[in-house]
Amino acid sequence: MSSLCPYTGRPTGLFRDFEDMMPYWAQRHSMLNNFNNIVPQQLNEVENTAQKFCVKLDVAAFKPEELKVNLEGHVLTIEGHHEVKTEHGFSKRSFTRQFTLPKDVDLAHIHTVINKEGQMTIDAPKTGSNTTVRALPIHTSAGHAVTQKPSSTTTTGKH
């Protein structure tokens, strides 16, 4: 007896439409392959040295008036909000980045600048005070303390 629906080697029904579209998805110049051109990647660079703490961000997709930089305690928050409305619709874009500043940053002298390429740089000089580090014993469940080899007791720029 022959089958009314011969086996074709691929599923039938619901998934057939998706399989028929597969050649279009695989095209080299499809919209999905150009996604990085549509939504730019933000550059995020953090530098923490003995002299300063520095954050660099690519904010070229935002106007300066669409950006906010706030400092609450030692938490630095950078926000951007962009909105475009036309008769055909609207688009919104936003981001938020937070950084916890080291304890030895001079909070009164933080400087923010945006260059003509849209790169935001936030420089926070450090006060130069050293942080003392002391080794703590590690206790095992048996009650023994493991002592560490002594190391330098003063560090700068390590957090």
Curated annotation (Swiss-Prot):
It holds the Pfam family HSP20. GO terms for cellular component: cytoplasm; cytosol; nucleus. GO terms for molecular function: unfolded protein binding. Residues 33-141 form the sHSP domain. GO terms for biological process: determination of adult lifespan; embryo development ending in birth or egg hatching; protein metabolic process; protein refolding; response to heat. Belongs to the small heat shock protein (HSP20) family. This is Stress-induced protein 1. It comes from Caenorhabditis elegans. The lineage of its organism: Eukaryota, Metazoa, Ecdysozoa, Nematoda, Chromadorea. The gene is sip-1.
